[in-house]
Each structure stands twice: as C-alpha cells, then as structure tokens.
Amino acid sequence: MLLQTSTWPEVEAYLARSKGALIPIGATEQHGPMGLIGTDAICAEEVARGAGEAAGVLVGPTISVGMSHHHMEFPGSMTLKPSTLILVIRDYVLSLVDHGLERFVFVNGHGGNVASTTAAFYEIHTTLRETRGAQAPDVRCLLVNWSQTETVVELCEKEFGDSEGSHATPSEVALAQYAYPDHIKTAALDPQGAPAGKFHDARNYR
C-alpha cells in the first residue's frame, strides 16, 4: 500500500489495523558511467514496495536526496546538509505520528545517510518529549540497510564475489535495471568488475 497512491479514507482504514510504515530513503548521486543517478533511492523504494506488498504495510514516499557531498564533483549529484536531512526526517515522521503511526522502518539505500538518520531518530524522540511530555506516543524508529541484510549478502557473495564492492555495486545496478528496464545503460569498462576497496580517512595519510 503506497501512501501517494492511496486516498485519505484508505489511510484511515489502514490506521484502524496498523501503526507501522516503511520509509524508503536513498540518494541522488553518480553511480559510475552505467549506473543511474537515482540508484540508491530506486533500490530502497523497490525493496520497500516489495516488503510492503508482502506484509501489508504502508509505504511512505521515498526520501530521494540524502547525504552525498562526497559525490558533488559528478554532474547531476545532489546533496543535503546533515542538519537539513535530520530535520526532513524529523518532520516527515512527526507528520505521520500526528495521524497515529508509531512504528517506522527506514529502508536505506545509501551508507552516507546512516549518521544523519540515526541523529534524526533522537531528534524525533526529543521533540515528542518536549512537546507532548507524558502524553507522547511510543514512537519507535529503525534503520535497515537493505544491501546488508543476511539474505542479500549471501546472494551477492554467491553471484558477484569480490566484484560486489561497496558503491555502484552489481547488485544495486541490477535492482535499478529491474525497476527501470527501459533505462539500462552500457559502458566500456576496464576492468569489467572492480575489486572491493577500503574506506580511508585522514589518518591513513598522516
């Protein structure tokens, strides 16, 4: 059940039987010469939609722009400041809390969103405590990185091995292609598959 394709009476009927929602959250950033810029958001949305259909759970609109400042050298990439993303998530959830929802699972498609999303959860609870006190509903939020779930990890190890990597991976490119088969891109890649790399920070270059 997608919120954006539902009517308010349908949502009202849903709220009579459930207080949960799935929230896809991704990013709008480069994914190499053949990966769609919306890959992270597309994948999160596709996974959330499938899970929502299977479990009969409401799926909210996708948060399509996330924390992608490290991709801004590539045309088309978009980003939010951490403070902006935190407030977007806070207001998004609190809007739904006003209607009676209390359980939120964020289906995440971008690693750069983790810190800000987690901080937003604290912001949500703080705001509810400050504004409603003892009358605040028992709101609970959970972040799930779809690509790190046990089943997906096992499948990727079987199908892609060391070529899976951590960004613009075969699994996410394949899922985006499944969602948008009319937008499959090709590019001359050398090598065809990049091995998994390591994340570095300033300490590695001292």
Label each PLM-derived region with a short phrase.
Residues 1-105, 109-206:
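Extended, histidine- and acidic-residue-enriched regions that form the cofactor-binding/catalytic faces
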